Amino acid sequence: MKKTVLSAAFGALAMGVAFASPSQAAEVSACLITKTDTNPFFVKMKEGAAAKAKELGVTLKSYAGKIDGDSESQVAAIETCIADGAKGILIAASDTQGIVPQVQKARDAGLLVIALDTPLEPLDAADATFATDNLLAGKLIGQWAAATLGDAAKEAKVAFLDLTPSQPSVDVLRDQGFMIGFGIDPKDPNKIGDEDDPRIVGHDITNGNEEGGRTAMENLLQKDPTINVVHTINEPAAAGAYEALKSVGREKDVLIVSVDGGCPGVKNVAEGVIGATSQQYPLMMAALGIEAIKKFADTGEKPTPTEGKDFVDTGVSLVADKPVSGVESIDTKTGMEKCWG
């Protein structure tokens, strides 16, 4: 996808979309701030926000960090949204703790702030969170991997390809969920890397992209060339891991699992590159977020969480062509009908 950089001042991608008439534009405006503008997940998120903004007559401006982990650009984007008089902000935060003071500044200025995909830390630092149940997403692929391996899971050698050093909540939740599903004690539920299960070879970071996934996989293979299970933060990282394994002739005897459910990722499940993936729905997250900002602007009402949860759950499905007993899943044909990117 061709990128157009419109705001070099804070190293973020910014795009104002005038979907409202001049009289309406002054009434309701919103900001979408994502981690990057290149990951298909966030591209689809922006599409969902833009379509819903057009439908509701909301003026939308979109911003993104230069890379996953670029929190400085997100901080600058929040400042811009406050100065522009936006009614609300949808944010997929790169640094879920470091961004909190700036989020609070926006809330103090009267903006509704909704975390998309990645909960802030603490969760109530945002007015609401619209997200996949990332713990469940991880648990589903962990259960599937354990059942697929059977008794061999007890002697597995597991590599974790994580997101960034700051350990954002989405990273922690997916890791912890996988461990629970696979039968590994995650120890501190809010921390990555404190586990003592001998099956874990190690963790490395990917920045959520293919190049990072390849490098992280190469690093962990040097640590232990007998790795046979790989948990990846997302499908671009999984694709990179596969390339690293292929380069040493290991691609057919290592089980890779992931989270995202984008069309390229679902295709990779169908082709055997990825064993299974948990599919999430970014377009819905963003569309619901724009609806919430419009409602807040019109009535002052804030979103309420899904019953029994502390966030608005936008759904998750396990995609696998080799189903296992006790773990509900959909096949890749159905996954392709629901995918994005």
UniProtKB/Swiss-Prot annotation:
Give the primary localization class. periplasm
Arranged from A to Z, the UniProt key words for this protein are: Periplasm, Signal, Sugar transport, Transport
Q: What induces it?
A: Induced by fructose.
Q: One GO cellular component from the entry? A: periplasmic space
* A GO molecular function held by the record: carbohydrate binding
- Whether Transport counts among this entry's keywords is yes
Which top-rank group of organisms is this from?
Bacteria
Instruction: From the Swiss-Prot or TrEMBL record, state where the protein is found.
Output: Periplasm
Subunit structure, per the record?
A: The complex is composed of two ATP-binding proteins (FrcA), two transmembrane proteins (FrcC) and a solute-binding protein (FrcB).
Q: What family name appears in the similarity comment?
A: Belongs to the bacterial solute-binding protein 2 family.
User: What name goes with this protein?
Assistant: Fructose import binding protein FrcB
